[in-house]
Curated annotation (Swiss-Prot):
Pfam families: BacA (PF02673)
Enzyme Commission identifier(s): 3.6.1.27
Keyword field: Antibiotic resistance, Cell inner membrane, Cell membrane, Cell shape, Cell wall biogenesis/degradation, Hydrolase, Membrane, Peptidoglycan synthesis, Transmembrane, Transmembrane helix
Lineage per the UniProt record: Bacteria, Pseudomonadati, Pseudomonadota, Gammaproteobacteria, Lysobacterales
Source organism, top-level taxon: Bacteria
Name of this protein: Undecaprenyl-diphosphatase
Family matches, as InterPro entries: UppP
Gene designation per UniProt: uppP
HAMAP family per record: Undec_diphosphatase (MF_01006)
Other remarks in the entry: Bacitracin is thought to be involved in the inhibition of peptidoglycan synthesis by sequestering undecaprenyl diphosphate, thereby reducing the pool of lipid carrier available.
GO CC aspect terms: plasma membrane
Reactions catalysed, as given in the entry: di-trans,octa-cis-undecaprenyl diphosphate + H2O = di-trans,octa-cis-undecaprenyl phosphate + phosphate + H(+)
Length: 265
């Protein structure tokens, strides 16, 4: 397989999995077993494609918030997005400096996929018993910020899975409202994470030698695919539960745990 086709597939995979509650990190690690490992810079660029995708998909919502800051409800919402991001940034930086992060290898990812699938089923079951609410409380904002840190510590957890369900359990029980808030918080979080990673790479000596055609193709693929996925998901969850994603995670996690010993042998 050519490097260009490999880059295209990885870009599509990033766009498909970044916003679904199935872990983009886990899927990229799995894909790299067959498509080859790419540089950290390549992975940052395809995540930038996902960032652009969600900004485009939510452009009307972002514009509405930006132009409606005169309304108290909009100011309150934006402030809570900011607080959730700050919690992630501060606690995440402390965790990173302390080295509290599992290695991005297949075994912890497999366990995270499996356990995360169970968590999704249990969380949605209990959240479904709550009265439907679409108001973001301060408790939800802080918890979402902390849940993003947890997702960073445990590769394969999925940022969207950990945050959407903690928001639902803590009172933001309407699925579409929980997803909307989580995606809004994800925009500054992903921007900051990518910027921090680029800064660290620069300090360590630059970005190395890249095939810019591969990088460009992967970026465009991640952007287009991510845009389609976000639009589809926001429509899907208005009428459906997350059960299919939970079952998929459990099956994939179990399959990986069964495959790993055979691959090692």
């Amino acid at each position: 397989m050519s490097d260009l086709i490999s880059a295209l597939l990885l870009g599509i995979l990033e766009g498909l999995t970044e916003f679904l509650p199935i872990s983009s990190t886990g899927h990229l690690l799995i894909a790299e077993q067959w498509l080859g490992r790419r540089s950290d810079f390549f992975n940052i660029v395809i995540q930038a494609g996902a960032i652009l995708a969600i900004c485009l998909a939510l452009r009307q919502r972002l514009w509405s918030l930006a132009t409606g800051l005169g309304e108290r409800a909009n100011r309150d919402y934006v402030l809570k997005v900011g607080v959730a991001f700050l919690v992630t940034a501060v606690v995440g930086l402390i965790v990173r400096k302390a080295g509290w992060q599992l290695p991005e290898t297949l075994q912890p990812v497999a366990w995270a996929l499996l356990i995360g699938g169970v968590w999704m089923l249990v969380a949605e079951h209990f959240a479904g018993k709550l009265p439907e609410r679409d108001v973001v409380t301060w408790k939800v904002a802080i918890a979402v910020g902390l849940a993003q840190v947890v997702a960073g510590v445990f590769p394969g957890t999925s940022r969207s899975a950990s945050t959407i369900f903690i928001a639902m359990l803590l009172g933001l029980s309407k699925r579409s409202a929980a997803a909307d808030f989580v995606f809004m918080v994800g925009i500054p979080t992903m921007f900051a994470a990518s910027g921090y990673a680029l800064l660290e790479m620069y300090k360590e000596g630059g970005f190395g030698t890249e095939n810019w055609a591969d990088v460009a193709v992967a970026f465009v693929a991640a952007t287009i695919t991510g845009f389609v996925v976000v639009k589809w998901l926001l429509g899907y969850i208005k009428k459906h539960r997350f059960t299919v994603f939970a079952v998929y995670r459990m099956l994939l996690g179990a399959a990986l745990l069964l495959w790993l010993p055979a691959a090692a042998g």
